[in-house]
Amino acid sequence: MIIEKAKSYGFCFGVKRAVEIAEESQNAVTLGPLIHNPLEIERLAKNYNVKYVETIEDIDENVKRVIVRTHGIPKDKLQNLKEKNVEIIDATCPFVKKPQEIVEEMSKQGYDIVIFGDKNHPEIQGVMSYSVHNRVYVVLDPKELEGIRLKEHIATVAQTTRKINDYLKITNYLIQNYKEVRVFNTICNATFENQDAVRELAKKADIMIIIGGKNSSNTKQLYNIAKEFCEAYLVESEEELKKEWFEGKKHCGISAGASTPEWLVEKIISRIKELA
């Protein structure tokens, strides 16, 4: 069986930067998981004593340094963190900071804000918090906008890990129904590249293995694209692989989410070779 990796996959710039920051910040804690990959979080805790807490209240008084996760945190939480006697190390991805800045600036100019994304995702919770008013609407589908009467001046941004075609559905609806719509394409280039690469590979493979955290938005997007073209599975570790998946298969494609380290990809490929 041929095992082929997608042309573009795995650690993106923002995640690589955050992991390097964590490795250089031994004994620090992160506010929320640094990235959406439990095995990499486990490695950082084991090798560098960089652990995470869920809330500011959970930060022990002995902690000297706190790392802000790649997804960013809400503005009020950042302010609360500044009031504590700790050094703040900001590992927010620069591509995530961009929609934060846009939302802050456009809301100051009086624009209603439409955000394409998952309102429960930490990145979006952070982006929302930068609006200076409460006319902020987070949607995943244009139908969610039908019952809302927006002002005539609208600015829109997208979660960095979403599919561009889904964002276009939102922007097309807004342009058809409102006079002024400022569209900011805040979807990350790495997301585009990984999605294009998985689509290309899935078209010629008869099975795709997508590696990454089950709670990772960008990994789920890769899995959803892959399964449009062939049998596909999303796994976090080699223990989840099953021998029967590979029976009769001739071409196995591999891709991985932006928070998936290369050591994990190689570990899973080794296990596939044993099973196939």
UniProtKB/Swiss-Prot annotation:
The keyword Secreted does not apply. GO terms for biological process: dimethylallyl diphosphate biosynthetic process; isopentenyl diphosphate biosynthetic process, methylerythritol 4-phosphate pathway; terpenoid biosynthetic process. The active site is at 123 (proton donor). GO terms for molecular function: 4 iron, 4 sulfur cluster binding; 4-hydroxy-3-methylbut-2-enyl diphosphate reductase activity; metal ion binding. Its cofactor is [4Fe-4S] cluster. Dimethylallyl diphosphate binds at residues 36, 71, 121, 216-218, 259. Transmembrane segments: none annotated. [4Fe-4S] cluster binds at residues 12, 93, 188. Binds 1 [4Fe-4S] cluster per subunit. Pfam families: LYTB. Its EC number is 1.17.7.4. InterPro entries: LytB/IspH. Pathway: Isoprenoid biosynthesis; dimethylallyl diphosphate biosynthesis; dimethylallyl diphosphate from (2E)-4-hydroxy-3-methylbutenyl diphosphate: step 1/1; Isoprenoid biosynthesis; isopentenyl diphosphate biosynthesis via DXP pathway; isopentenyl diphosphate from 1-deoxy-D-xylulose 5-phosphate: step 6/6. (2E)-4-hydroxy-3-methylbut-2-enyl diphosphate binds at residues 36, 71, 121, 160, 216-218, 259. Isopentenyl diphosphate binds at residues 36, 71, 121, 216-218, 259. CDD domains: lytB_ispH (cd13944). Keywords: 4Fe-4S, Iron, Iron-sulfur, Isoprene biosynthesis, Metal-binding, Oxidoreductase. Belongs to the IspH family. Catalyzes the conversion of 1-hydroxy-2-methyl-2-(E)-butenyl 4-diphosphate (HMBPP) into a mixture of isopentenyl diphosphate (IPP) and dimethylallyl diphosphate (DMAPP). Acts in the terminal step of the DOXP/MEP pathway for isoprenoid precursor biosynthesis. This is 4-hydroxy-3-methylbut-2-enyl diphosphate reductase. The lineage of its organism: Bacteria, Pseudomonadati, Campylobacterota, Epsilonproteobacteria, Nautiliales. The gene is ispH.
